[in-house]
Amino acid sequence: VYSFSYLDKILDFVIVNHLKPWLQLSYMPEKLAKYPNRRLFGANVSQPHSVSAWCQLVHEFLLHITDRYGLDTIKTWKFGLWNQPNTSSDLFGFTNENDFFLFYKSTYDCIKDFCPDIEFSLPPTYYIVGESYENWYLNFLEWCKKNSCLPDCLSFTYYDTKMISDKNHSKESFGFVYARSLSESPDGLKDFVMQVLRERRQLGLGNMPIYLSEWNNTPSQQDLLNDTCFKSCYIVKNILENYDRLDSFTYQALTDLMADDALPNKLFFGGLGLFTVNGIPKASYYAYTLLRQLGDQFLGRGDGYFITRKHNSYQIMLYNYKHFNYLYANGERFDMTETDRYTVFADSDPVTIELCLSNIPQGTYKISETYVNRTHGSSYDQWVSMGGLELTTPYEFDLLKKASSPGFHQKLMHIASDETLRLNAELELLEIRLIQITPVICPSDVSR
């Protein structure tokens, strides 16, 4: 007897909100588990005791969702198997690599026999440049090519975390909770993306889509920079530098309210989320609210800026990214405290960005600026300015939430014929700023 009642509730919610799910077929139901006591984060991560029984479950699930949502809808979804199978058997990996390869092949065949048009991905692979984990996925794809089960798209987990440092004693656990050995390079994600593109070409995979299914600069739920303006600027920099090289970015995570670890009894404890456990947006949340307002026509980019267009309007994203110092990357906090977390940036000077936009049609324009920095849009910094004490009442939480909105300023500017629009902006350390240039009709224009 198969019951998918809980899944129905989740998928119904996804569908009614006009979203498309990516279904990862894991964890293992305990009644199918070969090793019932093998658990991670409270769920079973064992291989099945019977691959045929597993495939029967997958088949019944496909029948169920097809009957409920229709095959045409299902074909717009994505499906995948397992999570990070290239990690050790202390995590998601199988003790015997060949067991996983056959497990994947059987699941792939089950899904493609049901409907060849269903998109089936590479199992989300934890990518570490230069490590044996990288070789795993290359070997796996070669095996898939030989066994007629090549995935339809590539899927990766990536963190800017070094796994070779003695300080990160838990290499086999990838430092999920306490990883403190971070990349010293500000371009770690870009280097990873370029490496994957080269490997895709070497494997002869053409333009196979590449999805970043889990990404952050750290997997740690206790990295104090997660709450600060560093994270909002990190998100903007890395998405804009790589937007045309990947097919998706999946940020880890939406909220600090994660079940993987016990939650500290603090508001800002360095959690990965865009929201605190109380639902207060962090600066990182506003990075996405600004990014989504960019236009669909790319015009240009450079150091600290990105320009788009939508119809007759222009959008310019500015950012002043600085990377933390070598000592912090290797786990030394020194004078960093709960209420002073910016001491790890050697260069704290503001930066001035000057841009000239030519061929702007004559007319009157509204220039709107929305910005996130330590004074505006950062709930952590607002909490510090309120005294840095733990909040205890709904009134206090509400005050903080209302005080943490981004800054905003707008003005009108008239552009004469053949005039160049000159913009000059000074950005604080780790500030992000969206400038929107929109044509308006003024009374004087109408009278003409």
Residue ranges and their predicted role:
Residues 1-62, 66, 94-123, 186:
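Aromatic-lined substrate-binding rim segments of carbohydrate-active enzymes
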Residues 10-20, 64-75, 106-118, 147-150, ...:
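A structural motif corresponding to the C-terminal end of an alpha-helix
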Residues 14, 61, 79, 107, ...:
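Conserved, mostly hydrophobic/aromatic
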Residues 27-29, 83-87, 124-128, 160, ...:
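Active-site-proximal loop/turn and secondary-structure-junction residues that shape catalytic pockets
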Residues 40-45, 167-185, 330-346:
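A solvent-exposed, charged loop/short amphipathic helix patch at secondary-structure junctions
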Residues 96-246, 267:
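Noncatalytic carbohydrate-binding groove/subsite architecture in carbohydrate-active enzymes
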Residues 212-338:
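Aromatic/acidic polysaccharide-binding cleft in carbohydrate-active enzymes
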Residues 319-448:
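C-terminal beta-sandwich/jelly-roll accessory domains of carbohydrate-active enzymes
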